[in-house]
Amino acid sequence: QMKEELAAHQLQVDIFGDPLSSIWKDRPAMPDSPAFIYDIKYAGKSCEEKISAIRTELKKKGVYALFISALDEIAWTLNLRGNDVHCNPVIVSYLLITQDEVTYFISPEKVTAEVETYLKERQIGIQKYDEVETFLNSFPGKNILIDPGKTNYSIYSSINPQCSILRGESPVALLKAIRNEQEVAGIHAAMQRD
């Protein structure tokens, strides 16, 4: 959106690579805490059920693929948690859901044997986190939905130019907002502990 607004004033923004790495000398490393499975007794729905619901929403809109970069949406969808962000049980990662497959982009050191088995049993492919742009550049899908408010420009610009990019709200945010019985019970229990 910013690129379009600047272009109206004959200004151009070109960002290649990580613009901060050359000036931020003591930048902390990416977090490397392991991912862990969020038990179904707390989640209330399996990740298969959630992925099926997401695919149904995508089909209604004629969308083939959804790229998710919001960490809370990824954690909710896959029933996985982590400790990568202080006071937030999320994992630095990306998720691509198509009508045919699911690909999870995560740093290999975060994937324990238990999590790897969990993902494989659910036919969720694992790709390296830092290979997401290369993957998207060769993505063969007809169209892909991204939430522009939650997706950075580097990811956006790496999507295969032959793929139609649809900008809109992620259906995961709306699905996640509808709490099931186990989630409501968890909220009540947390409030009682507070």
Please report, for each region that a protein language model flagged, where it lies by residue:
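Terminal domain-start leader segments
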Residues: 1-193
